[in-house]
């Protein structure tokens, strides 16, 4: 809907700017993985988790582009999006239980690795045949995708590795957790609209801590603080423009 009127009228909130003849939302997702655990001793356990995933998406729709002042005719644009993502993740961790005086420790250390490949395609078509009068909408537009122009055609590859160490300490009704992690990442982007290539390498140390007191009544107030790191895979829509940083 609209807040301001156009020629004394308002676009209703349930108005469909797309078209039933060109409106597709399709997604297929496949995942496979495993969880492995081996106990070397009562206080020493090894775990390994792995997962592979494939996600395929296709979208077809019309979007609002612009309109003339005080006009009831909307200029629309037809768009087709296709995206395929392949991901693999592996996590190895070792858990060790020990006591130092009256304090119980649960130590957790590990190494994880993640790799992904993301292919994106966005094509657009425009023309007066997509115009729509919102005061008297007539749907059933015919879209010719052979006239589309490519707006985005790229492939991004991510490799990320991380080392982490955590200690969870228990003393009477107190629980204190402290952990640290260091990440390395590399993002490679191939922009096929202008045959350009960019690469971004980042590394970061992050940490977290939390303190909890468990009352006998079951109430457990806590306080925590954490930092995090996530590689940025987003890129600009404009062809040939370098990725966001």
Language model regions located:
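Membrane-embedded beta-barrel scaffold of Gram-negative outer-membrane proteins
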Residues: 35-51, 55-63, 214-217, 221-222, ...
């Amino acid at each position: 809907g609209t807040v301001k009127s156009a020629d004394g009228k308002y676009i209703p909130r349930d108005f469909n700017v797309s078209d039933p003849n060109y409106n597709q939302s399709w997604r297929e997702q496949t995942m496979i993985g495993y969880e492995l655990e081996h106990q070397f001793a009562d206080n020493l356990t090894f775990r390994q988790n792995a997962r592979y995933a494939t996600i395929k998406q296709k979208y077809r729709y019309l979007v609002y582009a612009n309109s003339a002042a005080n006009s009831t005719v909307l200029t629309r644009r037809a768009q087709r999006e296709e995206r395929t993502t392949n991901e693999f993740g592996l996590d190895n961790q070792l858990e060790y239980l020990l006591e130092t005086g009256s304090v119980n420790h649960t130590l957790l250390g590990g190494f994880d690795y993640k790799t992904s490949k993301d292919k994106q395609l966005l094509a657009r078509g425009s023309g007066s045949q997509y115009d729509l009068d919102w005061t008297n909408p007539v749907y059933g537009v015919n879209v010719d995708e052979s006239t589309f122009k490519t707006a985005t055609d790229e492939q991004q590859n991510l490799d990320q590795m991380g080392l982490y160490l955590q200690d969870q300490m228990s003393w009477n009704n107190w629980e204190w957790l402290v952990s640290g992690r260091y990440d390395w990442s590399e993002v490679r982007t191939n922009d096929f609209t202008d045959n350009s290539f960019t690469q971004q390498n980042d590394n970061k140390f992050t940490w977290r801590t939390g303190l909890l007191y468990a009352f006998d009544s079951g109430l457990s107030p806590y306080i925590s603080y954490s930092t995090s790191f996530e590689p940025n895979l987003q890129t600009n829509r404009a062809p040939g423009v370098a990725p966001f940083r």
